[in-house]
């Protein structure tokens, strides 16, 4: 295979493939390897307080819609 010309230098395709693989692997595992263990464990967040709004009951809403549709 013919080499690619990058910034005036001839680069063989296999070097581009190796560089791509190393960049992807380094991007995934690099931050994990260089972070401290304390920073890796996020602080526990408190559970969300229940809101004053009632939760949406989807099944009831669908049944109400179907019932009103049948009346028409």
From Swiss-Prot:
Keywords: ATP synthesis, CF(0), Hydrogen ion transport, Ion transport, Membrane, Mitochondrion, Mitochondrion inner membrane, Transport. One of its GO terms (biological process) is proton motive force-driven ATP synthesis. Coiled coil: none annotated. It is found in: Mitochondrion inner membrane. Signal peptide: none annotated. Its main location: mitochondrion. The keyword Membrane applies. It comes from the Eukaryota. One of its GO terms (cellular component) is mitochondrial inner membrane. It holds the Pfam family ATP19. F-type ATP synthases have 2 components, the catalytic core F(1) and the membrane-embedded component F(0), linked together by a central stalk and a peripheral stalk. The central stalk, also called rotor shaft, is often seen as part of F(1). The peripheral stalk is seen as part of F(0). F(0) contains the membrane channel next to the rotor. F-type ATP synthases form dimers but each monomer functions independently in ATP generation. Mitochondrial membrane ATP synthase (F(1)F(0) ATP synthase or Complex V) produces ATP from ADP in the presence of a proton gradient across the membrane which is generated by electron transport complexes of the respiratory chain. F-type ATP synthases consist of two structural domains, F(1) - containing the extramembraneous catalytic core, and F(0) - containing the membrane proton channel, linked together by a central stalk and a peripheral stalk. This is ATP synthase subunit L. It comes from Pichia angusta. The lineage of its organism: Eukaryota, Fungi, Dikarya, Ascomycota, Saccharomycotina.
């Amino acid at each position: 295979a013919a080499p690619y010309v990058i910034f005036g230098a001839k680069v063989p395709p296999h070097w581009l493939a190796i560089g791509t693989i190393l960049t992807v692997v380094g991007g995934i595992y690099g931050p994990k390897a260089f972070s401290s263990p304390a920073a890796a464990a996020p602080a526990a967040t408190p559970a969300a307080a229940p809101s004053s709004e009632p939760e949406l009951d989807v099944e009831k809403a669908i049944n109400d819609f179907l019932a009103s549709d049948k009346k028409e």
